[in-house]
Amino acid sequence: MKISVFNGPNLNALGTREPGIYGADTLADIEAACRTTAADLGVDLDFLQTNQEGALVDAFHAARDTSDGVVINAGAYTHTSIALRDAISATELPTVELHLSNTHAREAFRHHSMIAPVCVGLILGFGAYGYPLAVTALVQHLKQGNAP
């Protein structure tokens, strides 16, 4: 089983960008934690971080042939990207939406997700720990044959 983990805009700055909101862990720290979880679960992972919306869309299309599911922190594109929503829907890959912060406890514009309706689940507000949670949840979902 293979899971892709996609990270959107500004997530390359984790560890230094607003640590009071996003925590002190870097993206490399998060990837290491995910790899540990994946090894325990016996699954392979690949990672992508991009600040470009089109690159995320392309990544979903490529993942259709290489991955069993996707964990995505789409960052700000969560709230704006119909293109990303359409890519998730078109590829039919089981996808978990993830956010480090509780977006519903923040600014009103962060309360709506364009992608949540086409994702199998949502994890938010647990900081860096949300990533291993999302990987674990997606693997469990896939092992259950995509049952809710």
UniProtKB/Swiss-Prot annotation:
Active site: 22, 99
Sites annotated Transition state stabilizer: 17
Pathway: Metabolic intermediate biosynthesis; chorismate biosynthesis; chorismate from D-erythrose 4-phosphate and phosphoenolpyruvate: step 3/7
Catalytic activity: 3-dehydroquinate = 3-dehydroshikimate + H2O
Alphabetized UniProt keyword annotations: Amino-acid biosynthesis, Aromatic amino acid biosynthesis, Lyase
Alphabetical list of InterPro entries matching this protein: DHquinase_II, DHquinase_II_sf
GO BP annotations listed: amino acid biosynthetic process; aromatic amino acid family biosynthetic process; chorismate biosynthetic process; quinate catabolic process
Matches recorded under Pfam families: DHquinase_II
SUPFAM superfamilies assigned to the protein according to its UniProt record, in alphabetical order: Type II 3-dehydroquinate dehydratase
Ligand binding (substrate): 73, 79, 86, 100-101, 110
Lineage: superkingdom: Bacteria
CDD domains, alphabetized: DHQase_II
The enzyme's E.C. designation: 4.2.1.10
Quaternary state and interactors: Homododecamer.
Family under the similarity heading: Belongs to the type-II 3-dehydroquinase family.
Protein name (database record): 3-dehydroquinate dehydratase
Organism: Jannaschia sp. (strain CCS1)
UniProt lineage: Bacteria, Pseudomonadati, Pseudomonadota, Alphaproteobacteria, Rhodobacterales
Gene (name only): aroQ
